[in-house]
Amino acid sequence: MIQHDNNKMYGTTILSIRKDKSVVVIGDGQVSLGHTVIKSGAKKVRRLSGDSVIAGFAGATADAFTLFERLESKLDKHPGQLMRACVELAKDWRMDKYLRKLEAMMIVADKSISLVITGTGDVLEPEDGVAAIGSGGNFALSAARALIDIKGISIEEIAKKAMKIAGDICVYTNHNVVIEKIEE
């Protein structure tokens, strides 16, 4: 769970689902300062690297933007190699005195791989194609896993239903979602 400091911006839910040669990343739009909602329509899911990569962040907003910029530069150095770019970012994040203090997590995905990147240097690929981060992450993850094997439901529907459940339960997650999709 994210620690709360009334002077920092925290809390969100980011969910990634990979199924049938498609991947979606969805995130809510709420930004909280302590226990107060200060923005409801933030865009925490973005496309990077010429739209071939989707990234979503949870945690301190300014820290996440710093990480987006760093990841973009790593992707420029290692085009088409998302895993390598993420490992390089995680190394910097863990080793650099300034970056080490950043309080955020990221989910990144391209057409072939989805990864969770943490500030402790972890670069994790979910076993089942479903990953979630943020204050409502466990709610969204549970809901997505429950829905993923149901026939006739699209990957976007799964993502939206899971985020609705997370938004209904987590006070730091709202229903204003941004969803991005990559298909093979």
Curated annotation (Swiss-Prot):
SUPFAM superfamilies: N-terminal nucleophile aminohydrolases (Ntn hydrolases). Its EC number is 3.4.25.2. CDD domains: protease_HslV. GO terms for cellular component: HslUV protease complex; proteasome core complex. It is an enzyme of class 3 (hydrolase). Na(+) binds at G167, C170, T173. The active site is at T12. Keywords: Allosteric enzyme, Cytoplasm, Hydrolase, Metal-binding, Protease, Sodium, Threonine protease. Its main location: cytoplasm. It catalyses: ATP-dependent cleavage of peptide bonds with broad specificity. It is found in: Cytoplasm. Allosterically activated by HslU binding. One of its GO terms (biological process) is proteolysis involved in protein catabolic process. GO terms for molecular function: metal ion binding; threonine-type endopeptidase activity. A double ring-shaped homohexamer of HslV is capped on each side by a ring-shaped HslU homohexamer. The assembly of the HslU/HslV complex is dependent on binding of ATP. HAMAP family: HslV (MF_00248). Protease subunit of a proteasome-like degradation complex believed to be a general protein degrading machinery. Belongs to the peptidase T1B family. HslV subfamily. This is ATP-dependent protease subunit HslV. It comes from Wolbachia sp. subsp. Drosophila simulans (strain wRi). The lineage of its organism: Bacteria, Pseudomonadati, Pseudomonadota, Alphaproteobacteria, Rickettsiales.
